Amino acid sequence: MTERKNGPAPAPGLIARLRRLVRPAEIPVPETRAAGPLGRALMAWSPPQGARWTARRYATLADEGYVRNVVVHRAVALVSRSVAAIPWIARDGEGREVSVPAFDALMARPNPRDEGTAFREALAAQLLIAGNAYVEAVGPPGRPRELHLLRPDRVTVQAGPGGVPTGYEHREGEQVRLIPVDPLSGRSAILHLKTFHPLDDWHGLSSLEAAAQAIDQHNAAGAWNKALLDNAARPSGALVYQPKDGPAALADDQFERLKAEIAEQFEGARNAGRPLLLDGGLDWKPLSLSPADMDWIAGRNAAAREIALAFGVPPQLVGVPDAQTYANYAEARLALYEDTVVPLAQAIARAFARAYGPGFGIAGLEPDLDEVPALEPRRAERWAKVAAAQDLTRNERRAALGYGPLPEEN
């Protein structure tokens, strides 16, 4: 017998079981597994048979992406929280900034459960994860008292003629209700916000769905890393059956029983370092990983960059190593706001203005970009340009900076 590893004593009785398993069968078995070039191996590498991708369903994507993938979770949280943190400015029909206490109160507390910032964060997150967000208004038409977010996978759009849905079906457990849509005005108690989808007239395409393959690759690389850690960062090897006499290969039942014994006694982190004692006819062939097999880290980082790209987030903001596309963190945050956060915040504000603005006497809603610290470099550039323009009047300068005119000025 030969000791192949150092560590604690072998499990009692294993050698006897191995002897019984490798003893030639008394009754020949008609079907046996053919011996390979090295004899009978309990482990073998095979080429990939085909990739398996996560199903494109909301619950599956949300679980595999937002719940289980740290890059997706960080990207969604970063964008949605940034969108929710920007306050809104209400304007009347002439473009003047106005304050409407009833609307301000609704936005500050849309419903008894949620405050305004958390509500807008969840809404933005649903758009990123599902490509759709459904807001139900409770109260008088056009002037709601409460706003509630409905889970996207529980709402079904009832298709109608002319691109206008006939209603929205909301299913929660056994309860099903239909929220109708006015066929003439298109108004409904449901405000449906959706992103562009080239293949669907009624639903949006989420960033999460676009990143699904990169998410699967990132998760698979993480699982591969975990499997290596569980097996001492290398495949243990192959146990080869090479008898001096008797059948050249184990029978099927002998093979399966021996494989089960090895798995129970030696596989996994809990058995790391356990010695393997071999009887006659058995030989241990240690295996190693090639540099390409070990290069899962590069593949995982590449997948993380693709995920960040799908969500419009600079990779360095989600912790991807060696992804310093921007000179510093401030420039990366500026790009995040200009390319992703501000456009999404503007789209949400415009949708709310169309749905609820008329009932409160509001002509338009827009994010107050002066309250965003990350955009300070752009504000400084604009102020410097306006100040340097000597041919502008005082009110023209104020208009260029987003302020209303002074009454005493022409």
Where are the regions that the model predicts?
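Structured, contiguous alpha/beta core segments that scaffold functional sites
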Residues: T2-W296, A302, E306, V313, ...
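Charged substrate- and nucleic-acid-binding regions of tRNA-handling and nucleotidyl-transfer enzymes
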Residues: V372-N410
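Surface-exposed loop-to-helix/strand elements on domain peripheries
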Residues: A233-D252, R274-A384
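Alpha-helix C-terminal capping segments
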Residues: I89-G93, F352, Y356, A389
